[in-house]
Amino acid sequence: YGLFKLSELIGVSPLAYWCKVKPASQKEVVLTEDNMGVSREPSVKYRGFFINDEWPAFGNWCNRRFGGFTATMYEQVFELLLRLKGNYLWPAMWTSRFSVDGPGLDSAVLADEMGVIMGMSHHEPCLRHGEEYRYLRGKDSIYGDAWNFRTNEAGITRFWKDGLIRSGKFENVITVGMRGEADSAIMGEQATLADNINLLRDVLHTQNRLIKEHVNEDLDKVPRMLALYKEVEPFFYGDAETKGLKDSEELEGVTLMLCDDNFGNLRTLPTEEMRAHRGGYGMYYHFDYHG
């Protein structure tokens, strides 16, 4: 960050590559005591963005310039993120698989080398990409052929386990919880609030066990995140008849990512009582929304 600050002081924009903002040519650069400073620790630990709704513009550009969502492309994204003083990224996920398309783990290795902390989107738990299941599922697959924790618990659990074994060695914030395929509700309309809450409680219990077994026995040393997005928020709070996930031991130490309504309107804030939650809170805010 210090080097990028020097770069900023001599006139290099974070968007130098992306918007062709060419730095002005200077015969000499003079930095004085007025340019000196000590950066405080950021008040927000994980700061970043999510490459989403990436087709057609970003996807076509990646294919033309880099042959896909490769590590060569992500090097430019990582540098932009760091120049903006960020450190956390959710990669593109509509048709791509960050830990496969590098090729292989090249993008993940590069992120780790550059100090970028990787996450996956709110519906991609345990370091697995939504698109991966579409490619790997099948009647004879070890992962089964249904994105359904009730009917295919063994297959889904194996899918998550293998993701943690593959990518858990890097610096990540691990998404927990579960939503339906293609970013949809996890259960059908016939399911009750209690059905959904009980399912997620079982999912979280399994995911925490897998993380302890394959990443670190001390869960407090593994950053984890649950996004209270769309229908997940009422599962968190519950109602007068049904206890929600809010005080579940499975969420101890998990960062709770609060969400807007996709149009910039904040849906919820932690109460005074909730602020003591050990995992803290995050914010998932749509700068732009397509769909």
Positions of predicted regions on the chain:
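Solvent-exposed alpha-helical segments and adjacent loops
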Residues: Y1-N60, R64-L84, E181, T206-R209
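Catalytic domains of carbohydrate-active enzymes, especially glycoside hydrolases
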Residues: G68-R97, P103-D106, L110-S121, K169, ...
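Gly/Pro-rich turn-and-neighbor structural signature
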Residues: K20-T32, G102-A108, D112-E113, D140-R278
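Active-site-proximal loop/turn and secondary-structure-junction residues that shape catalytic pockets
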Residues: W55, W94-S96, H122-C126, G180-A182, ...
